[in-house]
Structures are given as structure tokens and as C-alpha cells.
Amino acid sequence: NPVLDARGGPNHVGNFCGAPIMIDLDTKQVYYTPIFHILSQFSRTIRPGDAVLTTAVNSSQLPPDALHAVASINADGLISVQILNTGPAPITLGVTLDKHNAVITMPANALKTIQFNLAL
């Protein structure tokens, strides 16, 4: 469910769930959770019809599961690389695509998108 109340309902099994948007029915406050912002970023840079590209993350110097990446390309040749740092510390990394290179620093617990335009 994209929207749930502060207790994670309503749902059909009576357990507690999270959602992109949570609403406190008592105070009428709306909370946009981190997953809302992640989905928002993905939906702006990965569109229907885009193709997923093979990505490789060389993270042998990092804790397991600290760094994740996925890339896509659209019909205009724009490549979007989504990078997620799940660790508690910033990570400086290089991103290479053919002749394009970028060195970026990922803040702790952050998602970042970098884009390359192959048409340029």
C-alpha cells in the first residue's frame, strides 16, 4: 500500500507495515518516509521503456552490502546510474563508462544518481 496510517493499517492480516506515506489520523500529519524519496528519485530517472544495463560494484575494501548500483539507458542515450551507500560513513568511488569517468563521494546512508549522455 502506498499510504498507511501510523499503525501500518489498514491491512488484511493485522500486522504492522510501513509505506511510502504514513498518516497519523489523530494529528492529521502526513509523513513522507525514506522509501517515498527513493521511489521519487527512481521514477524521475528510470522511465518505462528504459533498458537495464549490467553494473559491477568492486567493493572488496568495504563492508558487505555497503554499496549498491543499478544503471539504465533511455532511447536518447542518457544513462542513469543509481548508487546507494548503506554504510555509516561516506564512500569516495569512481564510476567508469567507456570514456566517461566520475569520482564522487557518497554520503553515509545516501542514494545518488549520476547521468551520462552518450549522444555528447
Language model segments and positions:
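Substrate-binding and catalytic surfaces of secreted/luminal carbohydrate-active proteins
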Residues: 1-120
